[in-house]
């Protein structure tokens, strides 16, 4: 399983990269907004420069999302984003216009990530349109009392049934169990907030055992 970090924060990306477990990055307009403070002072060129800096840190796919609604606008913006760096993956929402844009990008050698996916039928359409990645949002489904991980299971089964090469990125991850369950289901990737990456490494018995070892070592050194 591959781990992406779901953030636009450069410090978090650097910290995750230092752990040796990072395979890529996903961003979206909301994550960008968290780091800029006043969005009115953050231009589109600033956004592109920020994506370029992320690409310098991580040698892997970096998803950058289009911020428009029509296929024509998505294609124009997506081509501009793809020109930033060879590792840029263009994120398109799973809408009718998004599918048109995904097909265009697929035919022209630009990698895509179909985002805001909440049903297996949407994921099936994404694969048929040629998306390289599909991002089911499990946490948001959990928020409305729907089993987000069941969606991941359905998508993995459908893709395996037909041999679709589209990789499943489990997104909107809220806690370590989302990651573990996704891995058990055979999802290709989990894109994880830095806070959850740290939680994956923590266990109270590890902390207790380490304290005991250190206490015993301190006695022996006396």
From Swiss-Prot:
Biological processes annotated in GO: carbohydrate metabolic process; pentose-phosphate shunt
Cellular compartment(s): Cytoplasm
Keywords recorded for this protein, A-Z: Cytoplasm, Pentose shunt, Schiff base, Transferase
PROSITE patterns: TRANSALDOLASE_1
EC number assigned by the record: 2.2.1.2
Active-site residue numbers: 91
A molecular function GO annotation: transaldolase activity
CDD domains hit by this protein: Transaldolase_FSA
Catalytic reaction list: D-sedoheptulose 7-phosphate + D-glyceraldehyde 3-phosphate = D-erythrose 4-phosphate + beta-D-fructose 6-phosphate
GO CC terms of this entry: cytoplasm
EC category: transferase
UniProt pathway: Carbohydrate degradation; pentose phosphate pathway; D-glyceraldehyde 3-phosphate and beta-D-fructose 6-phosphate from D-ribose 5-phosphate and D-xylulose 5-phosphate (non-oxidative stage): step 2/3
Functional description taken from the UniProt entry: Transaldolase is important for the balance of metabolites in the pentose-phosphate pathway.
NCBIfam families linked: fsa_talC_mipB
Entry's family note: Belongs to the transaldolase family. Type 3B subfamily.
The protein's name in its UniProt record: Probable transaldolase
């Amino acid at each position: 399983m591959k781990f992406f970090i779901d953030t636009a924060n450069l410090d978090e990306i650097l910290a995750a990269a230092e752990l040796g477990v990072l395979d890529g990055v996903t961003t979206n307009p909301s994550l960008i907004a968290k780091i800029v403070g006043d969005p009115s002072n953050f231009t589109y060129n600033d956004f592109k420069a920020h994506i370029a800096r992320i690409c310098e840190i991580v040698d892997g796919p970096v998803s950058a999302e289009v911020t428009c609604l029509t296929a024509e606008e998505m294609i124009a913006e997506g081509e501009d984003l793809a020109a930033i760096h060879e590792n840029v993956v263009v994120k398109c929402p799973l809408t009718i216009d998004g599918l048109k844009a995904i097909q265009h990008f697929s035919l022209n050698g630009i990698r895509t990530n179909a985002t805001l996916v909440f049903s297996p039928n949407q994921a099936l359409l994404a694969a048929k349109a040629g998306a390289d990645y599909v991002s089911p949002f499990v946490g948001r489904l959990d928020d409305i009392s729907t089993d987000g991980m069941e969606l991941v299971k359905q998508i993995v089964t459908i893709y395996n049934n037909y041999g679709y090469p589209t990789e499943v990125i489990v997104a909107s991850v809220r806690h370590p169990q989302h990651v573990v369950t996704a891995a058990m289901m055979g999802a290709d990737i989990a894109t994880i907030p830095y806070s959850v990456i740290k939680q994956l490494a923590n266990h109270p018995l590890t902390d207790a055992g380490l304290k005991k070892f250190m206490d015993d070592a301190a006695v022996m050194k006396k």
